């Protein structure tokens, strides 16, 4: 996906996103918040912040930020929300609560591999590629 951002240590002109959904009559926004906090805590992020956000297909919506000690700032890792009913029925053919999230793996990979600048992951550095067993563990 293209993003109209100034390229810097945490932004590129393009981004990748991994998405997930949970469909169940027994889930609500509290469950989504719990899934997100547990997911990022298990990845090793101690400070996870959920901020209100706007996404056209979800309501309630949040942005997920984690605190980056090295950069001394909050860094966004994804967005999430509850699919709006007018999205769910045409998509699934029935009404049910749907938890949805989209997470960018780039900044997560940076932390796992001690990379301080996202642009490093896209250089044609054969030594880096040979020395890196896998980007995602």
Show which residues each predicted segment covers.
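TRNA-recognition modules of translation machinery and tRNA-sensing kinases, especially anticodon-binding
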Residues: 1-137
């Amino acid at each position: 996906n293209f993003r109209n951002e100034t390229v810097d240590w945490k932004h590129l002109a393009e981004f990748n996103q991994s998405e997930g959904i949970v469909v169940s009559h027994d889930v609500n926004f509290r469950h989504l918040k719990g899934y997100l906090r547990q997911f990022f805590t298990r990845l090793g992020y101690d400070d996870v912040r959920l901020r209100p956000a706007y996404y056209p297909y979800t309501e309630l919506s949040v942005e997920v930020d984690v605190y980056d000690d090295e950069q001394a700032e909050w860094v966004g890792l994804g967005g999430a929300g509850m699919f709006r009913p007018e999205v769910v029925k045409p998509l699934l053919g029935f009404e049910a609560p749907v938890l949805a999230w989209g997470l960018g793996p780039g900044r997560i990979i940076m932390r796992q591999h001690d990379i301080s600048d996202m642009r490093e992951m896209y250089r044609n550095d054969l030594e880096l590629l040979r020395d890196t067993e896998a980007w995602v563990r």
